[in-house]
Amino acid sequence: MTLILGIDPGSRITGYGIVRDTGRGGCIYVASGCIRTGAGELHERLQIVYRGVREIIQTYGPVTMGIEKVFMAKNADSALKLGQARGAAIVAGAEESLEIAEYTATQVKQAVVGTGAANKEQVQMMVMHMLKLTSKPQIDASDALAIAICHAHTRSSLLPHGLGTARSRGGRLRL
């Protein structure tokens, strides 16, 4: 049973979620939460994201990580900051030798809810149902858990077909 880390990156709040892939199409909740960076300088916030993700990896020991791709925001500055936070999380995962896969928000919603047009509340409710949670996780943590679930489902559909792991392709799997 593989431990999977899901990351919902943000320059102020980065959600994380860890699930155990049962290998039978299901996942078991392990942990979730948010890395909050406050309102400091961007380089300080990126350092907090990097250190926070690295600490989570060292604490729980996941072997693979799914992370959300950057979407095109109306505000270019916000998209750039989001991309930088993503980069900090990816470097933390790479330094800990995790295989890393990237997913669009639409792919995650499709995998968890069944439609790429789902809203955050629908994703949150399906995450609660799939992981048998008794209370609502924070939205950013819920999104990260959804990314981890998406990664578990994608891995299980790819790996049996002889496509290998992301590691065999240089550490990053783009889907």
UniProtKB/Swiss-Prot annotation:
Catalysed conversion reaction: Endonucleolytic cleavage at a junction such as a reciprocal single-stranded crossover between two homologous DNA duplexes (Holliday junction)
Cofactor: Mg(2+)
Binding site for Mg(2+) 2: 68
GO CC annotation terms, alphabetical: cytoplasm; Holliday junction resolvase complex
Any coiled-coil regions, as ranges: none
Source organism superkingdom: Bacteria
Sites where the protein binds Mg(2+) 1: 8, 140
Gene3D superfamilies hit by this protein: Ribonuclease H-like superfamily/Ribonuclease H (3.30.420.10)
Pfam families tied to this protein: RuvC
InterPro entries in UniProt: RNaseH-like_sf (IPR012337), RNaseH_sf (IPR036397), X-over_junc_endoDNase_Mg_BS (IPR020563), X-over_junc_endoDNase_RuvC (IPR002176)
Gene Ontology molecular function: crossover junction DNA endonuclease activity; DNA binding; magnesium ion binding
Entry's cofactor comment: Binds 2 Mg(2+) ion per subunit.
The UniProt record lists the keyword Endoplasmic reticulum: no
The entry's keywords: Cytoplasm, DNA damage, DNA recombination, DNA repair, DNA-binding, Endonuclease, Hydrolase, Magnesium, Metal-binding, Nuclease
Enzyme Commission number(s): 3.1.21.10
Keyword DNA damage among UniProt keywords: yes
PANTHER family: CROSSOVER JUNCTION ENDODEOXYRIBONUCLEASE RUVC (PTHR30194:SF3)
Subunit structure: Homodimer which binds Holliday junction (HJ) DNA. The HJ becomes 2-fold symmetrical on binding to RuvC with unstacked arms; it has a different conformation from HJ DNA in complex with RuvA. In the full resolvosome a probable DNA-RuvA(4)-RuvB(12)-RuvC(2) complex forms which resolves the HJ.
Name this protein carries in UniProt: Crossover junction endodeoxyribonuclease RuvC
Gene name of this polypeptide: ruvC
